[in-house]
């Protein structure tokens, strides 16, 4: 985890040094791109509510869900987040928000119908761990320069098309190459960080409930059910894959190769090991 951030830091310093050496005046573009990604983080709960179609629900409508979230949040010193439900048969859950004081936990109607109370509690524990660890902030900061690099590559490409000056065109090519390499390496490192955060949230959620087996059972149920959901339904929620406890992907999807989440089998194996370590066998 720390090594990933060190590599990212070195990469970004080299990237900016090359731009400075070439005398590229892309600072305004970098500022704009950074502002956009930080605004996305600041309004993350509202953006996700809008894109997911999640609806904030009251305690009267979902008493059991509210009780689980309130109890676990109080037990772990976390302010109770807003509670939302997404009307889809895809079984899943996610958390978002810029801080523990401004956060949201959402579950789908599919997961409410699939899991028993203990399994649902384990999933909620996983999501509350994301909130407690400020994972949205961590991944946002890690993503800033990768977003800047992407915009610079696009800007350099379109700027190069319009330029007829050979020197300018040569500089543009260098900028595009450096920006693309930065983006690719950042992309891979950010996914490594994300997978680490998922393992950490599994451990944290299991520790919250004291029952790693239930989270393992929930993950297996969710992934198993996902294979039986119509493709159209899966595709309708894939924009939320980075947030979901398990990405909504078909089993043979090439997207699994670049997933933000570790394979379910490995997560389950680690949870079973955690159970052994807790002396539950």
Model regions and ranges:
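Intramembrane catalytic core of multi-pass membrane enzymes that act on lipidic substrates
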Residues: 73, 78, 91-92, 105, ...
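Short pre-active-site segment immediately N-terminal to the catalytic Zn-binding motif
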Residues: 57, 109-122
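Catalytic Zn2+-binding segment of zinc metalloproteases
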Residues: 128-144, 156, 213
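Active-site recognition of the HExxH zinc-binding catalytic motif
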Residues: 45, 107, 122-130, 134, ...
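Active-site-proximal gating segments in proteases and membrane effectors
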Residues: 78-102, 165-167, 205-281
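Hydrophobic or amphipathic, alpha-helical segments that drive membrane association/targeting
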Residues: 1-94, 142-199, 223-227, 277-281
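Alpha-helix N-cap and coil->helix boundary residues
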Residues: 64, 119, 140, 196, ...
């Amino acid at each position: 985890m720390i090594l990933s951030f060190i590599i990212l830091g070195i990469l970004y310093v080299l990237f900016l040094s090359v731009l400075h050496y070439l005398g590229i005046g892309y600072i305004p573009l970098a500022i704009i791109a950074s502002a956009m990604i930080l605004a996305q983080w600041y309004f993350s709960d509202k953006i996700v509510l809008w894109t997911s179609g999640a609806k904030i629900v009251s305690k009267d409508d979902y008493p059991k869900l509210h009780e689980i979230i309130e109890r676990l949040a109080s037990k772990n010193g976390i302010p109770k987040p807003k509670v939302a439900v997404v009307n889809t048969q895809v079984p899943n859950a996610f958390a978002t928000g810029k801080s523990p004081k401004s956060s949201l936990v959402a579950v789908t109607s599919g997961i409410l119908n699939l899991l028993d109370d203990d399994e649902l509690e384990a999933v909620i524990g996983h999501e509350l761990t994301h909130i407690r660890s400020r994972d949205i902030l961590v991944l946002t900061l890690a993503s800033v320069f990768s977003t800047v690099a992407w915009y610079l590559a696009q800007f350099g490409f379109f700027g190069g098309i319009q330029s007829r000056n050979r020197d300018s065109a040569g500089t543009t090519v260098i900028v595009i190459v450096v920006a693309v390499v930065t983006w690719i390496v950042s992309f891979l490192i950010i996914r490594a960080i994300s997978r680490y955060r998922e393992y950490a949230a599994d451990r944290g959620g299991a520790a919250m409930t004291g029952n790693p087996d239930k989270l393992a059972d929930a993950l297996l149920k969710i992934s198993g059910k996902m294979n039986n959901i119509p493709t159209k339904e899966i595709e309708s929620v894939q924009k939320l894959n980075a947030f979901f406890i398990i990405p909504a992907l078909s089993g043979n999807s090439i997207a699994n190769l670049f997933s933000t989440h570790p394979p379910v089998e490995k997560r389950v194996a680690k949870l079973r090991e955690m159970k052994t370590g807790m002396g539950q066998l």
